[in-house]
């Protein structure tokens, strides 16, 4: 088996096995996440999308596939085509309006926010430059903080942290933000991927992190869309 085939197979494990393990954990802790879904996954794994819809989870735009990213080298025509196809497929498969956007691997061009606002997107979650939401100059589009510093791919796949250290990082970050939150509040988003944390040797560390975080009082666990709406109405 070549390296490319192996990489595809590892990620397919996330769709076949890891997703369902994480699904069970989120149900266990009554967590309703925002799920960024690319167009290719929505077409190839409709049952996964339906499971999210049935639970009332938010579906957000996430491009076409991991191999078709928006970058600074993308032309405006290419970028519009990616956004258009992504949103069309997700709206068709989910039966709901798509309000948010998570760029593939946090990627975008200098025009992405402007284009997203023109497509009716209300928030983007690609910038780790704050701990609270903030508005942009693009038709009121809101940026939801999304830290790469505790993203599972960034820490475990790229920086090679052990899963127990990832758990500790997440809990330490949550604890600090919780204590810093009063009175204005802070936001912590946690990006996870089924192909990575859904593995048998890692899933228990996600369980332990979620157990710890859901044990805190006065924490609002919500979707990115609800967070954006709340911020817009109260800023």
Region spans (language model):
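Positively charged, amphipathic and often flexible ligand-engagement surfaces
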Residues: 144-165
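Catalytic alpha-helical scaffold of carbohydrate-active enzymes acting on polysaccharides/glycoconjugates
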Residues: 4-143, 167-190, 196-235
């Amino acid at each position: 088996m070549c390296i490319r085939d192996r990489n595809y197979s590892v990620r397919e494990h996330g769709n076949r096995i890891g997703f369902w393990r994480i699904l069970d954990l989120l149900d266990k802790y009554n967590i309703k996440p925002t799920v960024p879904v690319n167009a290719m996954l929505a077409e190839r794994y409709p049952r996964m999308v339906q499971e999210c819809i049935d639970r009332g989870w938010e579906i957000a735009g996430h491009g076409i596939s991991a191999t078709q990213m928006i970058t600074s080298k993308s032309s405006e025509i290419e970028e519009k085509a990616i956004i258009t196809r992504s949103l069309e497929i997700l709206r068709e498969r989910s039966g709901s309006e798509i309000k948010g956007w998570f760029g593939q691997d946090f990627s975008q061009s200098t025009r992405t926010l402007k284009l997203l606002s023109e497509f009716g997107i209300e928030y983007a979650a690609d910038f780790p430059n704050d701990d609270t939401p903030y508005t942009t100059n693009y038709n009121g589009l809101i940026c939801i903080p999304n830290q790469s510093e505790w993203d599972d791919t960034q820490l475990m796949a790229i920086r090679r942290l052990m899963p127990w250290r990832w758990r500790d990082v997440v809990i330490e970050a949550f604890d600090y933000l919780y204590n810093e939150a009063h009175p204005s509040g802070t936001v912590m988003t946690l990006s996870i991927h089924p192909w990575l944390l859904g593995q048998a040797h890692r899933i228990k560390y996600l369980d332990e992190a979620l157990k710890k975080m859901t044990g805190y009082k006065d924490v609002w666990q919500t979707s990115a869309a609800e967070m954006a709406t709340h911020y817009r109405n109260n800023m």
